[in-house]
């Protein structure tokens, strides 16, 4: 087996970076779950996609730079009523970047809160259905209110 002249690792990384830059769109919308999240000025995340049997099908590092995070985080919180956190399913607008030392990562430039709201609504409906099947959904309604309360709490 004959090979062409060998490349240095940094040359190969440069070729990979150039190929990605030339052949990819400027941004992509990506569905993923936040597997880890760290705030240190910038927001560092690890995004995962899980298969049907809950094993990890894909995993990548993502960064939301401080200037973007200060815009996106309050917007997401205002729309969904919660902060970005581990376990949330999110729809992110990302730029793909490749660095010779750090490898491939995603830079977060946008977020669609309606995707997360849809996922939360689906989870809520599944929980309600499960509680109804277990017979505990209407248990509180079966309790009667006494005509004369025995205890009063003052706060």
PLM feature spans:
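Acidic, two-metal ion nucleic-acid-processing modules in DNA metabolism proteins
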Residues: 1-155
């Amino acid at each position: 087996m004959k090979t062409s002249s060998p490349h240095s690792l940094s040359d190969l990384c440069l070729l990979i970076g150039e190929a990605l830059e030339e052949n990819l769109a400027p941004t992509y919308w990506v569905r993923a779950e936040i597997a880890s999240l760290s705030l240190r000025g910038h927001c560092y995340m690890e995004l995962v996609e899980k298969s049907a049997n809950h094993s990890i099908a894909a995993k990548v590092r993502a960064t939301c730079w401080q200037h973007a995070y200060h815009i996106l985080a309050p917007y997401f919180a205002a729309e969904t009523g919660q902060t970005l956190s581990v376990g949330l399913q999110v729809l992110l607008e990302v730029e793909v970047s490749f660095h010779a030392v750090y490898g491939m990562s995603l830079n977060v430039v946008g977020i669609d809160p309606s995707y997360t709201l849809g996922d939360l609504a689906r989870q809520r409906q599944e929980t309600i259905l499960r509680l109804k099947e277990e017979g505990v959904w209407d248990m509180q309604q079966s309790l009667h209110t006494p005509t004369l309360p025995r205890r009063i709490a003052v706060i």
